[in-house]
Regions:
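Short, low-complexity, disordered segments immediately C-terminal to signal peptides
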Residues: 1, 8-34
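Active-site beta->alpha N-cap acidic-glycine motif
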Residues: 35-141, 145-156, 173-177, 183
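C-terminal domain-boundary segment and adjacent tail
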Residues: 45-68, 251-280
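Structural recognition of the beta-strand scaffold that forms the well-ordered cores
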Residues: 74-77, 112-116, 138-141, 185-188, ...
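Acidic-and-aromatic substrate-binding clefts and catalytic sites of carbohydrate-active enzymes
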Residues: 84, 92-93, 116-125, 188-195, ...
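Charged helix-capping and loop-helix junction motifs
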Residues: 96-99, 224-228, 255-259
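An active-site-proximal "capping" alpha-helix that borders the catalytic cofactor pocket
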Residues: 160-178
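His/Asp/Glu-enriched short active-site or ligand-binding loop at hydrolase and phosphoryl-transfer sites
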Residues: 193-194, 198-235, 269-280
Length: 280
């Protein structure tokens, strides 16, 4: 789990899968295309990138009048990670869920987007259904296998280009089979690693890939205050924060959240789901 989760939340997550400085993920040629509005009943998606590649969303961009950039909104996102080979560890008592974190989000009334793995949904179907039927949340796709969609990527095994679409569709199927209803057509690459080949492979799925501009640093952290401070220092109007929903490898996220939320609200921020952030 070490390398997998570290890559999932790493500040070095990047398009090519190679390390860069700890800033926002590097943009690809397909990043930040123009918004495209779906039917009124559905969540927004982005228009395809150059050459029809899967579009990539990292944060809310400024509108022509700058209004969108000055709107003090922020999206907290949580990766529900569990790799395909960790069922035995879960059966042995290791916790890859974090019901306390979800309870805190409900208590604090924080709309959030959970990027859920298909394997996680299979292991915790009741929790997946509870999250996915609560209008406070929306569930997005974080793959089924947590294999890398471009390599190298923090030691993750690679998924072949011909299997990428099936991996994503398998995850959506596993999530929906739990009874989750609030499922959005967004996808987060394991490790944040992608390239043009993976963007091309996923284009037929119609998903919008979602990255981030603020890394919480909660993976394997032991100091909740340090995690909270990193988020509070990094957030700007329109930011998208990556955190985790797994007690096994992100044990202080719940504690950090209880400082992050009041801290940002004191600064005038409003919490939104990715779908609202994308809607602009």
């Amino acid at each position: 789990m070490g390398g997998a989760l570290a890559g999932c939340a790493s500040p070095e997550a990047t398009r090519a899968g190679t390390a860069v400085l700890p800033t926002a993920p590097e943009k690809s040629a397909a990043a930040s295309p123009s918004p495209s509005r779906p039917p009124e009943s559905g969540p927004p998606v982005l228009a395809p990138g150059p050459g029809g590649l899967t579009p990539v969303f990292e944060r809310r961009a400024a509108g022509r009048d700058g209004a969108a950039a000055s709107d003090k909104v922020v999206a907290l996102t949580f990766d529900a990670d569990m790799t395909a080979d960790q069922g035995r560890r879960a059966a042995g008592g290791e916790h890859f869920d974090n019901p306390g974190l979800i309870a805190s989000l409900r208590r604090l009334k924080v709309p959030s987007t959970v990027f859920m793995m298909g394997r996680w949904a299979q292991e915790y179907p009741d929790q997946a259904r509870s999250i996915g039927t609560d209008p406070l949340f929306e569930i997005a796709n974080h793959s089924f296998s947590h294999h890398a969609f471009s390599s190298p990527c923090y030691g993750l095994p690679a998924v072949a280009a011909k299997d990428m679409r099936a991996d994503v569709e398998r995850a959506f199927t596993a999530i929906r089979r739990t009874g989750a209803r609030h499922v959005v057509p967004y996808f987060r690459f394991p490790g944040g690693c992608y390239d043009d080949a993976s963007l091309k492979a996923l284009a037929p799925t119609g998903v919008t890939a979602v990255q981030w501009d603020v890394v919480s640093g909660d993976a394997f952290a032991t100091d909740a205050d340090a995690v909270a401070e990193q988020v509070l220092e990094g957030v700007r109007p329109g930011s998208l924060v990556v955190m985790h929903c797994t007690r096994s490898a992100a044990p202080v996220t719940d504690d950090a959240l209880r400082r992050i939320v009041p801290g940002l609200r004191e600064r005038g921020y409003r919490f939104v789901k990715v779908s609202e952030l994308m809607r602009g």
